């Protein structure tokens, strides 16, 4: 059930082209962010930082392979090789870009609301940042996801917080729309 969002992040990981030993980061701690941590960890980074807005996501981030966790209001470094942004806000995109060293690679996967203030083009040019975007998953990303999952390097189950029978669809919708930070993915079983 969670391979589709994982495939979108596989597309981001492919575009990021993170090499073993590079310093990598993920901005965002939702489902996409946790998949990004797992994909980047599989590439043997020297350091894997996760930046989010909620302290309660640190344990899960570390479980998936993060070596450091910070909230975006803490002091953040500016010398990472690769950053994948998954939060879907303009401020997350700006935070992600600020984490990069000159010549670093940024992959944006989140979609901010219409009219959001974007990245500073002068900053992108002067710092020679390489910027990629992802929307959906092409066939190579799906293949990569299935291989990584089959190899045991991708674990979506900790992201599922509730499993309900299909007959409880309305309860599932209520849970998802509740805004409760303890509600992750809700899985309906037929």
Residue ranges and their predicted role:
Residues 1-73:
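Mid-domain Rossmann-like dinucleotide-binding core that forms the NAD(H)/NADP(H) cofactor-binding site
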Residues 6-9, 33, 80, 93, ...:
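A general structural signal for well-ordered alpha-helical segments in protein cores
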Residues 17-19, 88, 101-102, 154, ...:
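Short conserved AdoMet
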Residues 51-54, 86, 110, 135:
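N-terminal Rossmann-fold cofactor-binding loop
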Residues 75-83:
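A short acidic, Gly/Pro-enriched loop at the edge of an enzyme's catalytic core
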Residues 90-151, 189-190:
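Glycine-rich phosphate-binding loop and adjacent beta-alpha segment
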Residues 139-190:
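C-terminal hydrophobic helical "lid"/dimerization subdomain
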């Amino acid at each position: 059930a969670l391979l589709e969002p994982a495939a979108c992040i596989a597309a981001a990981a492919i575009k990021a082209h993170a090499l073993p030993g590079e310093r990598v980061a993920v901005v965002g701690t939702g489902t996409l962010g946790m998949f990004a941590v797992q994909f980047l960890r599989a590439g043997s980074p020297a350091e894997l930082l996760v930046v989010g807005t909620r302290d309660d996501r640190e344990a899960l981030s570390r479980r998936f392979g993060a070596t450091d966790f910070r909230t975006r209001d803490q002091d953040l470094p500016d010398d990472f090789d690769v950053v994948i942004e998954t939060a879907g806000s303009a401020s997350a995109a700006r935070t992600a870009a600020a984490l990069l060293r000159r010549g670093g690679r940024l992959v944006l996967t989140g979609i901010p609301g219409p009219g959001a203030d974007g990245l500073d083009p002068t900053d992108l040019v002067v710092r020679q940042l390489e910027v990629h975007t992802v929307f959906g998953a092409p066939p190579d990303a799906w293949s990569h996801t299935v291989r990584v999952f089959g190899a045991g390097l991708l674990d979506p189950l900790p992201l599922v917080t509730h499993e309900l029978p299909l007959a409880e669809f309305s309860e599932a919708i209520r849970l998802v729309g509740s805004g409760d930070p303890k509600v992750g993915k809700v899985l309906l079983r037929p």
